[in-house]
A protein has these predicted regions:
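Bacterial Sec-dependent N-terminal signal peptides
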Residues: 1-31
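A short, solvent-exposed beta-edge/loop patch
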Residues: 105-138
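Early exported N-terminus immediately downstream of N-terminal targeting peptides
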Residues: 28-77
């Protein structure tokens, strides 16, 4: 019995160090539910990139999801963002025709990395929403400038 406890403890320690950082991305954020619930549905486009793919951008983690013509998913995403907004350090919103169409949340840094949630919704038909989560050591204003820079 003691031997099996030692083995279990040893395995737990290995797993704790072996779990990649990406598994912790979005930890304790409600938006993770959006990616989990809708990420593999038909007609949804989800992209997740980690350090290797993001070297030129100075991001350590990038995840996005685009959902079209699903009012339930849009409402659910807005609810999740509203909950994550409670812990945000900075909040920026764009209002169009009396309706919030874009949201930028600067979350409290985790370790030495800044975290951003970006949301954009098209109110025209077909309705479409984009949700992006980014982790980076880069200053959040620089991240925003890079994302919004026109090519």
């Amino acid at each position: 019995m003691v031997h099996s406890k030692k083995i279990c403890l040893w395995l737990l320690m290995i797993m704790a160090f072996a779990i990649p950082k990406q598994m912790n991305a979005q930890q304790n954020l409600q938006i993770s539910k959006v990616f989990d619930q809708y990420g593999k549905k038909k007609g949804v486009m989800m992209v997740q990139l980690t350090k290797e793919m993001l070297q030129g951008y100075n991001f350590s983690f990038f995840k996005s999801i685009v959902i079209k013509n699903d009012p339930g998913a849009i409402d659910f995403t807005r609810e999740c963002i509203a909950k994550d907004q409670e812990g945000a350090e900075k909040i920026k919103q764009v209002v169009q025709n009396g309706e919030v169409t874009s949201i930028v949340l600067q979350l409290a840094p985790r370790k030495d990395e800044n975290r951003l949630i970006l949301y954009n919704e098209s109110t025209e038909n077909p309705r479409e929403m984009t949700l992006i989560y980014i982790e980076s050591k880069m200053d959040t204003e620089k991240i925003m400038n890079m994302i919004l820079k026109k090519k």
